[in-house]
Every structure is written in structure tokens, then in C-alpha cells.
Amino acid sequence: MKGGRMSTDSRVGTRPLPERPNLRHLKDQAKDLRKSGAASSLADAQFRIARLYGFASWPKLEAHVESLEEIGQLKQAIDANDVARVKTMMTRNPPLHRAPLGYGKDGPLTWVTECRVPWEPPSPARLAMAEWMITHGSDVHQGGDGPLMRAALNGYRIPMMELLVAHGADVNAMWHGHFPIIFAPCESMDAAALEWLLDHGANPNLRDPRQSAASRPYPGTALDYLIASYARSLERLGACIEVLLEAGGETRYDTPPVLAVLRGRLDHLAELTRADPGLVNKRFSELDCGQTGGRLLLLQGGTLLHVAAEYGNVAAGALLLERGADVNARATIDEAGIGGQTAIFHSASQFNDYGLPITRLLLERGADLTVRVKIPGDYERPGEIVECTPLGYALLLGGESQGRTVALLREWGAVE
């Protein structure tokens, strides 16, 4: 093997092919193996190379790599909006309609409808490509309506959604058997795509069928999924909530003051806290949401100020503080001693400094930067519990993407 020795001992197990395997490179590996004396012939060397990558024979490995190369060429044609090339390739080799391409490997049609490369609204060429594929062998339902699920992530793809539904795509389908199509625009917080699905018959209260079987609350309805999602934009969140409520959407987070903060309804929040001043420091144990920024921390046991900090609602935060909310109120601490974070832990650990404005508000109102708590850590390390200050948490999770928030905390004398 060029550049170093390659073990072909079967005892070391197989290795995965490179992401973009090259047949010429594999042939060179076999030749190098033959020259090294580790194989008795070129055929023996090719067999050893095939087995190294988990294939029963060289012809099987060769056929697999050639198919991947052809799939790569098809993707290039799609990305270039080269309708003629796509037609030629798929007509010559119809199985390409089912090639493992696109999100979830659902197929070329899924990749076409997502309009990711180039990132733009579906052009006439892209729409023509999708329609030709559907009428010549591509399954509009591939992967559980994967094409519609990916198109529904963005409102400017509505022309593609219209085409798919016209050809039988189901707005109430379950992508891969468990993810309602309506969850897609909830994840991306796209009110236009969400409203289009609802106007075309999507059920706002459709649930993951595995949820009922397991008797668990997550992910719940579309409104539950929206509120519990990781994306952050107060404007877009509020718009999507309004669309779902108008369509009869239900949520387990149906607590008036919480929804007032999430919807950006300051008038309603002011009315509620005026009628019941104790709301500003009440803790809400039912809030199993608020996970973002690559962290596992939730809002359970937090106050309305924690909610405002988590979702970046500066105006709501200011109103709550003016009404007597404790800027250093701690969330509930469980029997294991986990919890007790103040609102600033939520605002200081958002992606891309999203929480910077409300972090500044909390600091100006006296947020304690020395408080140290034990709380859930990184999303990639389930079960991790970290002991930290607000600055320590921001450094742990935000990295360079939290540069301005970290700098602000340091300006105010924060300690790790």
C-alpha cells in the first residue's frame, strides 16, 4: 500500500470504505499487496482487498464502487439542475431511482425536492426534474414521504410541496414510520410551510406512534415539538405557535403565563402577573423543554424568567423583573442535588450568542456570577453532570460561537 503498510490479516477485522471510494486506488492497493509478496497473485491480492472492506469477492467490491461512482455522478447532475443528464442516467439505469442518496438515504427524489444544492427556491428546471422522476419511476412516498418532509423545511419550497402533493404525497405521513411530516417546519420554525401543510389537511395533533406505545410524552404534538425544539428565534417561534393554535393545535405546555412568554404576548403576560403577582417567582415543574446549545439542560422547575432567558425574550424578562421577579431565583434541585441554576445559565449557553441581549439585561439587574450548580452537560454525553458557574457553562458548551457572551461575562467579573 502506498504511503504505508496495510494489514490484510482477517483477524484484524474489516474496515469501512472511504466516503468516496475510488476503483483505481483499490486496484493500486491490490497491486502493491502483490508486489510486497503478501499475496500469491493479483487475483489473490484483489480477493484480500475485497475481504478487507467486507466484500465476499473482488467483483462484488468492484460493482459496489462503480455504483457509488454513478450515484455521485447523478448527484452532480441534480446539483447542476441538468435535467437532460438526469433523464439519460435514470433511463439507462432505472434502479438509480432507488439509489441511497439524499437525507436519510431516502433516494434521489428526496435530494431533488430539498433544493439544498444550489440553496435556492425550486427553479423551473428543478420542478421539471422532480415531476419527470415521479412519472418515470421515483416513489413520491420513499422513506415515508421523505421528499415532502425535506421540502417542508422551508416556505420557499412550497411550489415543490404543491407538486409532490399533486402526485399523491401525504401531508399526514410518518417519515421513517415515526416522524410526522408536520414536525419538519416546526423544527425549522417556518410558519409559511407549516400553514401550507395545515391548509392542505395536515393534522396539528398527530403524534409519533411509538410515543403512545411507550406511554411517554415526547415528542407529543406539533406544538409540543415546536416548543421543545433546539432552534431559537422568538419571532419565528411566536409565528408558528399562532399558526398551530389557530388550527386547533394542542400542547402539554398549555400554561397561560408560559405561552404568553413564548408567543411574545407582553399584554397577556402583564395582565396575568397583575392578577396574580406570585406568578413572577412561581416554579414550573412541567417544563421538560428548553434543550438547545448542544446541552441537556431543561427548564423543569424554572421560573418565567428562566423561560424568557431560554428563548431570548428580553421584553418579557424586563417586565418580569419590574414586577418583582428574582433575577437570582434558582430552579428546583432534585434529590440527587441536580438543578438550582439561575436564569443566566440558560441565556449564556445559547448557540451563536443568541442569548447575549437578555444576558446583558440579567447582569444589569444583578445576576450573581459566582453561583455554582450541578446541572446536565453536553448533549453528546448523555448522563453527564457538570458543576459550574454561568461562565464555566458558557465555556463548556458555547466555545468560540459564544465569544461575545463570554467576553461580556468576563467584563462583569465572572469566574469559572
Question: Which functions belong to the PLM regions below?
Answer:
Residues 81, 125, 155-156, 189, ...:
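Ankyrin-repeat intra-repeat helix-capping/turn positions
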Residues 90-96, 127-139, 162-170, 195-204, ...:
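Ankyrin repeat domain, specifically the short helix-to-loop turn at the C-terminus of the second helix
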Residues 66-76, 200, 227-275, 356, ...:
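Ankyrin-repeat-protein effector appendages
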Residues 69-76, 98-118, 141-153, 174-187, ...:
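Ankyrin-repeat boundary/"N-cap" motif
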Residues 84, 128, 159, 192, ...:
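Structural detector for tandem alpha-solenoid helical repeats, activating at a conserved register
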Residues 2-88, 92, 111:
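Intrinsically disordered, low-complexity eukaryotic regions enriched in glycine, serine
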Residues 103-104, 121-128, 155, 159, ...:
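Residues within HEAT/ARM-like alpha-solenoid scaffolds
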Residues 68, 96-97, 103, 115, ...:
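Alpha-solenoid repeat scaffolds
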